[in-house]
From Swiss-Prot:
One of its GO terms (molecular function) is tRNA binding. This is Threonine--tRNA ligase. InterPro entries: aa-tRNA-synt_IIb, aa-tRNA-synth_II, aa-tRNA-synth_II/BPL/LPL, Anticodon-bd, Anticodon-bd_dom_sf, Beta-grasp_dom_sf, TGS, TGS-like. Homodimer. SMART domains: tRNA_SAD. Residues 1-61 form the TGS domain. It is an enzyme of class 6 (ligase). GO terms for cellular component: cytosol. The lineage of its organism: Bacteria, Pseudomonadati, Pseudomonadota, Gammaproteobacteria, Cardiobacteriales. Catalyzes the attachment of threonine to tRNA(Thr) in a two-step reaction: L-threonine is first activated by ATP to form Thr-AMP and then transferred to the acceptor end of tRNA(Thr). Also edits incorrectly charged L-seryl-tRNA(Thr). It catalyses: tRNA(Thr) + L-threonine + ATP = L-threonyl-tRNA(Thr) + AMP + diphosphate + H(+). Its EC number is 6.1.1.3. It comes from Dichelobacter nodosus (strain VCS1703A). It comes from the Bacteria. Belongs to the class-II aminoacyl-tRNA synthetase family.
Length: 640
């Protein structure tokens, strides 16, 4: 006779075991109609699952984030249902939920095309419109294996074979003639699926292993309503216009090519942006007391084994063998910084010691995940490592957070979200060390009144971390900065200092990156500003154009004045109409377009126009220089 406690504290008693659907019906018909799943304690379950004991119960609808995630997961099953009707020989692999939607990996001889997606989506719409019921059956593992063997679903069988020995049953979901396997929960019927769209195709591999079977991945998005879907698609259309790959090509910033997958060829203009950011960060490093260092590109396997990276990260490392020794190209900079710290015994009076490096890192990311300069194999990280005593941790974390916010503000990101990621299953170090590390980060955030959300299990293998996520002009979120507390690696690599009592102690190591990788951050900036970079970041800050050849000497002299003032100015002496030049440099997103004719030459002035088409009139050269210098020095997002 279970007693159910509802979110408002009210209780309901039942004479026998009861399902989530029956509980919803006992509360009201409208809730029963809207119900998608049920939360029992902390666990989400299907409405058809029975509850035999006393429990805290919440009915989940599409108004809950969990409900929307369930809708998206069920859309993946709907995709499988429709696809097997259209291409019966295809083999279904996995279909998880991702941000805003879902995907399904498929093995098939047929090569899917964008035209196929339209056909597949239409079949999904027809199936969803019937509102058919989804049936769940708990099935013995052996029987589930037989079912998928009969259906020639080889990958489902492999998944079953990977189950732990104590797993006796598996949840099978029946979508009419289609069967899928999942932990669930899922919607009780297709009437709950109201708005979805298939979006793109890509390649993938079984378990992400490039040596395993090649698969095809179909992506989709799903929302609560058609309006939410339409809003999302409108946003995506705007994001498409801002695609950093397209803008990077149009503005001659960089390129990528097959001979160097995941590695960027920086052109002069793109490299100007890169170096401007690097130089800006150096000013912050000096302000906050960092020593800039540089470590080797490759290190012996033995060091990576000591640090724990070989065991936890080995599959993503590029390796080589030299003189019968295994080496790895560094995927991160921290072990190298410990080696620098270890040169000469340190005193507590020297702490904290703050190292920074624009470290070139390489990670063997799967080819299917590479994306422009946002996801690459060779990148530079604005890495920093602070070695300090335990009683200095809180102050250093607070200083680092101030530095992070200062940097983001200068780049125009005002909306920053924080998350505290705690210990993962695979980790190094004792629980006591993790307790202290997690507590240290949380107290530092609370001391600064910084709001954050907890992300259990998402920390690095060597310590918990604070993650800084930027929200851009389209409302998209980009996780960039991290601050990670590490009590483990310094001990593993023999880092020590002498305390005030003359005893050897192991320092605490704080890992921090603000921009993340410079490549990815530049990609974010390009999309944030749609290529219209703030003046201080613009590769060319002013383009000076003579109306005729008779004004060429004048503009050349003017350009030298701009350059002497530290402004990146160029001149366009081509024999083209001035209107043509203005249009071309407007498309190149040059902030200031400066024109010189007879009037300007005689009065030692320039006619000023901005890239957004605003005419600022005729201005004296000194005034223009002063204005542009002010915009550069203040890191202004404006150009007027």
């Amino acid at each position: 006779m279970p007693t159910i406690t509802l979110p408002d504290g009210s209780k309901k008693s039942f004479n026998a075991a009861i399902t989530g659907q029956e509980i919803a019906e006992s509360i009201g018909s409208s809730l029963a109609k809207a119900a998608i799943a049920v939360r029992i304690g902390e666990k989400l379950q299907d409405l058809s699952d029975t509850i035999a004991c006393d429990a805290d119960v919440t009915i989940i609808t599409d108004k809950d984030e969990a409900g929307l995630e369930i809708i998206r997961h069920s859309c993946a099953h709907l995709l499988g249902h429709a696809l097997k009707q259209l291409w019966p020989q295809a083999k279904m692999v996995i279909g998880p939920v991702i941000e805003n939607g879902f995907y399904y990996d498929i093995e098939a001889d047929h090569r899917f095309t964008p035209e196929d997606l339209a056909v597949l989506e239409e079949r999904m719409q027809k199936l969803a419109a019937t509102g058919y019921s989804v049936k769940k059956e708990w099935t013995p593992v052996a029987r589930a294996r037989e079912i998928f063997h009969e259906r020639q679903e080889d990958f489902k069988i492999r998944l079953i074979d990977d189950f732990d020995a104590d797993v006796k049953e598996v949840g099978l979901y029946y979508h009419q003639e289609y069967v899928d396997m999942c932990r669930g929960p899922h919607v009780p019927d297709m009437g709950k699926i109201k708005a979805f769209k298939l979006t793109k195709l890509s390649g993938s591999y079984w378990r992400g292993d490039a040596q395993a079977e090649a698969l095809q991945r179909i992506y989709g998005v799903a929302f609560r309503s058609k309006k939410e879907l339409d809003d999302y698609l409108t946003q995506q259309a705007e994001a498409e216009k801002r695609d950093h790959r397209k803008i990077g090509k149009a503005l001659d910033l960089f390129h990528l090519q097959e001979e160097a997958p995941g590695m960027v060829f920086w052109h002069a203009k793109g490299w100007t942006i890169y170096r401007e950011i690097e130089n800006y960060m150096r000013t912050k490093l000096r302000k906050y007391g960092y020593q800039e260092v540089q470590g080797p590109q490759i290190l012996d396997r033995s060091l990576w084994e000591k640090s724990g990276h070989w065991d936890k990260f080995g599959g993503n490392m590029f390796t080589c063998c030299i003189d019968n020794h295994d080496f790895a190209v560094k995927p991160m900079n921290c072990p190298g910084h410990v080696q620098i710290f270890n040169q000469g015994l340190k005193s507590y009076r020297e702490l904290p010691i703050r190292y920074a490096e624009f470290g070139i890192c390489h990670r063997n990311e799967p080819s299917g995940t590479l994306h422009g300069i946002m996801r690459v194999r060779r990148f530079v990280q604005d890495d920093g490592h602070i070695f300090c005593a335990r009683n200095q941790v809180r102050v250093e974390i607070e200083r680092t957070c101030r530095m992070v916010y200062e940097v983001y503000d200068d780049f125009g990101f005002k909306n920053v979200e924080l998350a505290l990621s705690t210990r993962p299953e695979k980790r190094v170090g004792s629980d006591e060390i993790w307790d202290e590390a997690e507590r240290g980060l949380q107290e530092a955030l609370e001391a600064q009144n910084l709001a954050f959300r907890l992300q259990p299990g998402e920390g690095a293998f060597y310590g918990p971390k604070i993650e800084f996520t930027l929200k851009d002009s389209l409302g998209r979120r980009w996780q960039c900065g991290t601050v990670q507390l590490d009590f483990s690696m310094p001990a593993r690599l023999g880092a020590e200092y002498i305390d005030e009592h003359g005893e050897k102690q192991t320092p605490v190591m704080i890992h921090r990156a603000i921009l993340g990788s410079l490549e990815r951050f530049i990609g974010i900036l390009i999309e944030q500003y749609a290529g219209n970079m703030p003046v201080w970041l613009s590769p060319v800050q002013a383009m000076i154009m003579p109306i005729t050849d008779t004004h060429a000497d004048y503009v050349q002299n003017v350009m030298q004045k701009f350059i002497a003032a530290g402004i990146r100015a160029e001149i366009d002496l081509r024999n083209e109409k001035i209107s043509y030049k203005i249009r071309e440099h407007t498309l190149q997103r040059v902030p200031f377009l400066l024109v010189a004719g007879d009037r300007e030459k005689q009065s030692n002035t320039l006619s000023v126009r901005t890239r957004d088409g605003k005419e600022l009139g005729v201005m004296e050269i000194a005034t223009i220089i002063e204005h542009i210098r002010h915009l550069i020095e203040t890191k202004s997002q404006e150009i007027e």
